Amino acid sequence: MNPIMKSSAHHKLYLLATFWTLGLLFLGSIVHATGSSLACPDWPTCYGTMFPKMTGGIFWEHLHRLVAGALVILFAVATWVGWKAEDKRPGIRIWSCVGILLLLVQSVFVALTVILKLPYAISTTHLALAFLFLTLVTVLTAVTSPQSTTVEKQNLKKLSDVEKIGVLSAVLIFGQSVLGGVVRHTGAGLVCADVPLCF
């Protein structure tokens, strides 16, 4: 049997990490929507402790931090299992390490977001990094699935028209999401009082 077909443990972990990341993004939106982003004034602790009283905005903000911390551990385990698996494709190992690097950089931006009191540039970068990581872990989930048997390098010229449209759509969605983050973090959501026109 193809060794790639047998190596499904890291695929399952990447799949779990994908849904975990989606949940974390949703939780992050709740934190912002409830005005809880600065409910914990310090980082990585909350009022000097890792176990604050989980009430009001502290509940959402600290829960967001705990779930994010669990994601770092989950993805690190997935990467380790992937390295130990029979699937030796270098691209998977490289991009897994890139994922860990993204999570570490993301942690720095989380700290800066709290310390600098939500500057919109850093908050938007925090959101953009989250979407980049979601993209990365989704791709890792796809290429480690039992259905994925492609081991050859593929470039953009070899993509079908449908695949090119998919890539373009992903880029546009990412751009729109980041732009939406800028609008939200700068408080410009209601600058235009009517839709689809603006004044």
Where are the language model's segments positioned?
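Polytopic transmembrane helical bundles with strong interfacial aromatic enrichment
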Residues: 2-199
